[in-house]
Design a protein with these regions (language model features):
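Helicase motor core with emphasis on the C-terminal RecA-like subdomain
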Residues: 1-191
Length: 191
């Protein structure tokens, strides 16, 4: 599966607990894992006799929009800038159940394929007036933490990132996720 090799090492180590304390119950939760990923998780955690409960991945509060991307990076960044500003100038991104009723500034993520692209897109969005910072695996831990804290506190509006950012994020005023580059798999869109 897509998570097989890069599955968080801390989670992979949980199998040690299962082996050492066989009678202690273990619960694995995921919001978007495919059947194959679920099988991988069960195998990695040593869960042989277990119950699986699934809900629908159809989220009524999400909508998808596909736009043709401009051919140059500056033009594509201008498109993202315009889309973000146009969407929120009208009181919120259009779509079922999406609003800014929390009274906080809407924020979001712009996913890029490479670390280099995150830096280039971030620089261009900042030049266009969007408060943004980039996030990727080559940043020092303290720098990644700082970006996350600034975003969570509302001091920056957009994180331009690779897939190194995103899993486990729970921020109430996230109103958009832009894939600047096509995701590798449909799983990445759900994440």
């Amino acid at each position: 599966s897509a998570w097989g090799h890069d599955f968080r090492t801390d989670y992979q180590a949980l199998v040690i607990l299962k082996r050492r304390f066989e009678l202690v119950p273990l619960l694995a939760l995921t919001a978007t894992a495919t059947s194959q990923v679920q099988r991988d998780i069960k195998e990695m955690l040593g869960l042989r006799l277990c119950e699986t409960f699934r809900g629908s991945v159809d989220r009524k509060n999400l909508f998808y929009e596909v736009l043709e991307k401009a051919s140059t990076l500056p033009e594509a960044c201008q498109q993202v800038h315009n889309w973000i500003n146009d969407s929120f100038r009208m009181g919120g991104v259009t779509g079922p159940g999406i609003s800014n009723s929390l009274g906080t500034t809407p924020c979001g993520l712009v996913y890029c394929f490479s670390k280099k692209e995150t830096e280039q897109v971030c620089e261009e969005l900042r030049r266009l007036g969007i408060s943004a910072m980039y996030y990727h695996a080559d940043l020092e831990h303290q720098d990644r933490s700082k970006v996350y804290e600034l975003w969570c506190s509302g001091k920056i509006r957009v994180i331009v990132c690779t897939v190194a950012f995103g899993m486990g994020i729970d921020k109430a005023n996230v109103r958009f996720v832009v894939h600047f580059t096509m995701a590798k798999s449909i799983e990445n869109y759900y994440q």
